[in-house]
Amino acid sequence: DGGRIRRSMAALRLSIDDAQAQKREQQAQPIRLLPGARPRRAAAPTFAAAGQSTQMIVGADGANDATILATSAQLYGAYRLKRVYYSAFGPIPHASATLPAQAPPLLREHRLYQADWLLRFYGFAADEIAPQAGGMLSLDLDPKTAWALAHPERFPVDLDRAPREQLLRVPGLGVRAVTRLLMARRARRLRVADLT
């Protein structure tokens, strides 16, 4: 039930915010030790310091990739999750008749991870990645290449003038490569020899 999941994630987010506020208040108060007293160890954090994550089982219900990515984007934005993990459903013998009898292709899980990366690090929105017709990612093309082929009007890109956001949408250019291109552009115009 999506509503129940969202309510529990919201409650978790509020608890994390409260714990962080409480920690800030405690850190602001001066610590006074009695003469001869040994300092105590700090209490373990209530929530994981690295952030919260969740997992989605892909293929256990009729949810398409667009729905899964929209849910992931909402979890990242509204609940500030650090990571969403995807696992392909694996059927088990004598399971409920409501569950599928066949597992989805493992490549679907891989494509969802690629799309998730585009959401988190490349500035893509969930509705840009998954196609509107059917809502399923292509198993033949990675999501960034599929997006580029669906938007030929955005290409070619001038590497000497394009902003970071536009360069991140070029297939084959990752975050580090774009950062290096931008640094090289400060020194001089880019040449073909610079790109090899």
Feature annotation, model-predicted:
Residues 97-169:
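Long, highly charged, low-complexity intrinsically disordered interaction regions
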Residues 19, 122-126, 174, 188-189:
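Short secondary-structure junctions and interdomain/linker hinges
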Residues 24, 66, 127, 179, ...:
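Short linear functional motifs in flexible/disordered or boundary regions
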Residues 1-124:
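Conserved AdoMet/S-adenosylmethionine-binding subsite of the radical SAM
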Residues 49-52, 143-144, 171-172:
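A short alpha-helix capping/helix-coil boundary motif
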